[in-house]
Amino acid sequence: MIVSICILILLVCIYIYFFPFIPKQKKHYTYALLLGCPAHDDGTMSSSQIKRCNLAIDMYKKGLYGTLIISGSNVKNEYVEAEVMNTYIRKRVEIPTILETHARNTFENFKLSKKYIQEQDVLILA
């Protein structure tokens, strides 16, 4: 029993030596990019949209970013993803936002938002 405890302590010490704890740095990003997803066909928000918007609100309240870029077009139906999500967020908190309303997929979300982000670090919210 004592030998097992000693071996366990030794293994923990070895692990700590080779894999030390690195605290997460709380970084502030100039921009956060909120990736759009389709609303329901009747224009109501999908659960994915609501979850993503709530994540954006929470991260803003924690001070992790300054301006929110919401990216997404009307891919599945007539409702523009970025506009639907922006309406939801604006009813809950005032966040500086940029709407990118032409992206039709994730690749285009990044490509078309690049003009705003430039070379800045960005927080991706999905």
What are these regions (language model features)?
Residues 1-24:
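N-terminal type II signal-anchor transmembrane helix
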Residues 16-126:
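A structural signal for short, hydrophobic/glycine-enriched beta-strand patches
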